[in-house]
From Swiss-Prot:
One of its GO terms (biological process) is proteolysis. Transmembrane segments: none annotated. It is an enzyme of class 3 (hydrolase). Residues 18-99 form a propeptide. Its EC number is 3.4.24.-. This is Matrix metalloproteinase-18. Belongs to the peptidase M10A family. It comes from Xenopus laevis (African clawed frog). Keywords: Calcium, Collagen degradation, Disulfide bond, Extracellular matrix, Hydrolase, Metal-binding, Metalloprotease, Protease, Repeat, Secreted, Signal, Zinc, Zymogen. Cleaves collagen type I. May play a role in larval tissue degeneration and adult organogenesis during amphibian metamorphosis. May be involved in tail resorption. It comes from the Eukaryota.
Length: 467
């Protein structure tokens, strides 16, 4: 509910600015960077009211806490490393919290048929690719609403689109490469609805930064009256996320917000989008779980949680923000401690990862490991370090793979029910940690002692996430 309300707040023109050319300025300290950030996106010292509303709290601290709360960070009021990390991410130039009205539907266009005009083109892409990206970005919104978008060429349009750099006379200068990627203005006359893209960025049509379609779709959300969302998986989240543009689906959070403003589409079957998993949702199901150089990685559709054993909370991020070339909705994953590589499986293919990089020569076919052609996918994979074996689970059977000999062990596959009594056949994920084997089946996890072949305890799957 908070996310939806935030998105329906009225966007306004941005008033504060970073230096137009960062290269001409001496490097800012973290404190200076944070102050500029809070001025620009949280109205530090410019919101027209008392900045210290809470007794005994300095304005900077209050705004910093506001920013930390918005991004779901631990609210410390101090410039801790996680807060600095978020502030340094590339993002949209529109306010997160600050000078906007709580008027909801009045922030929308008062018509359903809108026009747009592309004033100029970036040299980073062929003109046709820019036109396609812009058209597709508008289609993201027209697919879920009654809105239509028509391109015009000579007359002034509702939404004017331009590529520009530095100070471009709208009181919101760009800041050079990185930092702010683009900004847009609320619906209205004049500059209202217009979208500006920083020409100092490198624009692409691939998943490499920065994908024009993804940034444009976000900015056009502002052009239609949406504000930023606190939902990390939403298109209208302030920071840029490196996701595959080919498989992009408008998240449900964005659908709910835009339909509140303009109503539903005329499609007989209303489109739905993916939702962001909640850490303590009792219904969360993991696609795969693996260790990674001392950390734990939990995959859920297009997301992953990254958890250090000594950390109290897990960090949620897009899979493709971590590994840009990796597919989403993977089937299985495990870490080979000998090579320190992560093996990730989807369908009949698997990929080896060394840190953030895909190992050369991958993806490969799973049949190169010795699986019969009847196996179409792997349900779960886990490496048992004390045995030097990797177990692969598929349907009701499992295989044992010798990592030293690089071949399947003889006598396999075997029945899961025979060798792992009490464990259901259909396994979603598995991993080995500190001498215990953990099986994830639906919302439950089974802690298993491989020596005694007994279930030690049954817990909720997300207990690893602090729930």
């Amino acid at each position: 509910m908070n996310s939806l309300l935030l998105k329906l707040l009225l966007c306004v023109a941005i008033t504060a600015a970073f230096p137009a050319d960062k290269q001409d300025e001496p490097p800012a300290t973290k404190e200076e960077m944070a102050e500029n950030y809070l001025k620009r996106f949280y109205s530090l010292g410019t919101d027209g009211g008392p900045v210290g509303r809470k007794k005994h709290i300095q304005p900077f601290t209050e705004k910093l806490e506001q920013m930390q709360k918005f991004f779901g960070l631990k609210v410390t009021g101090t410039l801790d490393p996680k807060t600095v990390e978020v502030m340094e991410k590339p993002r949209c130039g529109v306010y997160d919290v600050g000078q906007y009205s709580t008027v909801a539907k009045s922030s929308a266009w008062q018509k359903k048929d809108l026009t747009y005009r592309i004033l100029n083109f970036t040299p980073d892409l062929p003109q046709a690719d820019v036109e396609t990206a812009i058209q597709r970005a508008f289609k993201v919104w027209s697919d879920v609403t009654p809105l239509t978008f028509t391109r015009i060429y000579n007359e002034v349009s509702d939404i004017e689109i331009s590529f520009t750099a530095g100070d471009h006379k709208d009181n919101s200068p760009f800041d050079g490469s990185g930092g702010i990627l683009a900004h847009a203005f609320q619906p209205g006359n004049g500059i209202g609805g217009d979208a500006h893209f920083d020409e100092d960025e490198t624009w692409t049509k691939t998943s490499e930064i920065y994908n024009l379609f993804l940034v444009a779709a976000h900015e056009f959300g502002h052009s239609l009256g949406l504000s930023h969302s606190t939902d990390q998986g939403a298109l209208m989240y302030p920071t840029y996320s490196n996701t595959d543009p080919k498989t992009f689906q408008l998240p449900q959070d964005d659908i709910n917000a835009i339909q509140y403003l303009y109503g539903k589409s005329s499609n007989p079957v209303q489109p739905t989008g993916p939702s962001t998993p909640s850490r303590c949702d009792p219904n969360v199901v993991f696609n795969a779980v693996t260790t990674m150089r001392g950390e734990l990685i939990f995959f859920v559709k297009r997301f992953l949680w990254r958890k250090h054993p000594q950390a109290s909370e897990a960090e949620l991020m897009f899979v493709q923000a971590f590994w840009p070339s990796l597919p989403t909705n993977i089937d299985a994953a495990y870490e080979n401690p000998i090579t320190e590589q992560i093996l990730v499986f989807k369908g009949s293919k698997y990929t080896a990862l060394d840190g953030f990089d895909v190992v050369q020569g991958y993806p490969r076919n799973i049949y190169s490991l010795g699986f019969p052609k009847t196996v179409k996918r792997i349900d779960a994979a886990v490496h048992i370090e004390q045995l030097g074996k990797t177990y692969f689970f598929a349907a009701k059977k499992y295989w044992s793979y010798d990592e030293d000999k690089k071949q399947m062990d003889k006598g396999f596959p075997k029945q899961i029910s025979n060798d792992f009594p009490g464990i259901p056949d259909k396994i979603d994920a598995a991993f080995y940690y500190r001498g215990r084997l953990y099986f994830f089946i639906g919302r439950s996890q089974f802690e298993y002692n491989i020596n005694s072949k007994r279930i030690v305890q049954v817990l909720r799957s997300n207990s690893w996430l602090g729930c």
